[in-house]
Every structure is written in structure tokens, then in C-alpha cells.
């Protein structure tokens, strides 16, 4: 388990773009992670998306999954951004949205390592709320030295 202070050691993102609040399960041997994002009405994006019917933007759900996958990648390599390595989100395959995410939801983020070739990492990711699927995708990240 990782609290927000440890997460901040593994992700360079900060408010309002840090989208992982807690890691509840991380297994390097099984190459998987489970984390969550508590979605609050105070999120800045709800001011414009949409004021009368607030919904978390899909691109931010994808980013949250990518951040969880990034933590897994750093843990697998036993590195941190402070060591001079970053993961850049470079694409996604098989992307699907199934249900909206609204204020008060706890967005569960799961990622499993698929492959790494020439510093291009691929993860199978899912996001859910209350056991209902919200989004799934293969997230592709590039490992880069600073």
C-alpha cells in the first residue's frame, strides 16, 4: 500500500493533475497494481464539464490509469523520477468508455504489465466505480531518461 506522500515520490504530477490518491495493492512479481482516485465536486474540471451535470472527462480517466501504470513501471524497475527516469504517455489501444464518473465516486484503477520493447511499455488497464466498468484500454508509455 502507498499513501499520497509515497505516490508523490513515484509520480512527477502535482495538483490539480495528480490523479492517484492511494495504491491499495501492488505486486511487482505479478506485475499488477490497484489504486484509486476519490472524485470530489471540488475538482477544477467540474466547473466546465459540465456545470449542470458534472462528469469526469474521459481523457482524465485515461490519464489516471496511465499514472497508476507509471507507478507500476517505476516499482518494477526500482526507480523514481528523482533517479532521472520518466514515463511519457504516448498512446492507447482498445480504448472503451462504458459509464460516466461523477462527483462522490471512488474511481478504482487497475493496471497489469503486458510488455516492454525498446523502452516502450504496454499495460492493460481498467477503471471502475462500485464494481461497474468505466473505462478500459491498453496504455502505452515511453521510458525516457532526463
From Swiss-Prot:
Described purpose of this protein according to its UniProt entry: Involved in unsaturated fatty acids biosynthesis. Catalyzes the dehydration of short chain beta-hydroxyacyl-ACPs and long chain saturated and unsaturated beta-hydroxyacyl-ACPs.
Enzyme Commission identifier(s): 4.2.1.59
Top EC category: lyase
Matches recorded under PANTHER family: 3-HYDROXYACYL-[ACYL-CARRIER-PROTEIN] DEHYDRATASE
Top-level taxon: Bacteria
Gene Ontology annotations for the cellular component aspect, listed alphabetically: cytoplasm; membrane
Subcellular location, record wording: Cytoplasm
The protein's name in its UniProt record: 3-hydroxyacyl-[acyl-carrier-protein] dehydratase FabZ
Annotated InterPro entries: FabA_FabZ (IPR013114), FabZ (IPR010084), HotDog_dom_sf (IPR029069)
Reactions catalysed: a (3R)-hydroxyacyl-[ACP] = a (2E)-enoyl-[ACP] + H2O
CDD domains: FabZ
